[in-house]
């Protein structure tokens, strides 16, 4: 089941999901929590942060955070997509990204951009983006640090 309205309890849930993955630094997971706070305080439209949650048997097991890119006509960023490690590789991520794409399209969005790390740890993530129809648009070498490129993917809706 999917829902797009965050609750106050979702902040700790998404931090738990991110921590379970082993992909993110603590300062990164805190940012995700702050985006929920922004959404709850200002609303999705004013904050620019929309959410999609995947719930399974009453438990949130994955989420996306996305929003329009300022000063563009119809481009959106996918800021976050994560699935709890116990539910990875079960198709939940694919369903989450498809539901997110539907919402972006319904809002008039025509492109979604995703940024991720070029580190080896993220190889499966980059493969996931390719499998779900995203194209590698650019690589910014050593962006995050030596040997850690920023990989930018795009999908036309």
What positions do the PLM features span?
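Conserved GNAT acetyl-CoA-binding A-motif
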Residues: 104-117
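Glycine-rich ATP-lid loops
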Residues: 89
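Helix-turn-helix
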Residues: 125
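Conserved catalytic-core motifs of GNAT/GCN5-like acyltransferases
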Residues: 115-118, 130-151
């Amino acid at each position: 089941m999917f829902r797009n309205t965050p609750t106050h309890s979702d902040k700790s849930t998404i931090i738990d999901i991110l921590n379970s993955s082993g992909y993110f630094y603590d300062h990164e997971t805190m940012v995700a929590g702050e985006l929920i706070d922004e959404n709850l305080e200002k609303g999705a439209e004013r904050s620019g942060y929309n959410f999609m949650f995947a719930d399974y048997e009453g438990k949130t097991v994955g989420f996306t955070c996305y929003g329009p890119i300022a000063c563009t006509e119809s481009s959106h960023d996918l800021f976050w997509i994560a699935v709890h490690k116990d539910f990875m590789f079960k198709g939940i991520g694919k369903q989450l990204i498809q539901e997110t794409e539907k919402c972006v399209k319904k809002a008039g969005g025509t492109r979604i951009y995703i940024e991720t790390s070029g580190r080896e740890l993220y190889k499966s993530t980059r493969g996931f983006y390719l499998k779900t129809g995203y194209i590698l648009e650019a690589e910014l070498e050593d962006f995050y640090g030596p040997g850690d490129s920023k990989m930018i993917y795009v999908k036309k809706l």
